[in-house]
Amino acid sequence: MNLRGKQKRFLRARASHLQPLFAVGKEGLTANWLAQLDGALDRRELIKVNILQNADVTTDEVKDFIEGQTDIQVVQTIGRVLALFKVSANKDMRHLSDQVKKI
């Protein structure tokens, strides 16, 4: 699902109240971390990821890694925090994506 500007704005507003659920540390980006991230997005659809100061990767590298390996979309980047969105594979969990489609 490609997001339009209004849809991203809606998701950014929703993400502003969330706390980061995942962190990227000195271990960097691994396939296991990405699998856990993907599983969490299947349940929540919208989460935040914090890039710790001791991480060896930049925000752009994390964004490129996530978007290149999966169908997760980066909705917003503020400093070292990314807001991520993915439509849930489980139809019962698609509350947020149903609202986004109506916009």
Regions of interest found by a model, annotated:
Residues 1-103:
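Positively charged, polar, low-complexity stretches
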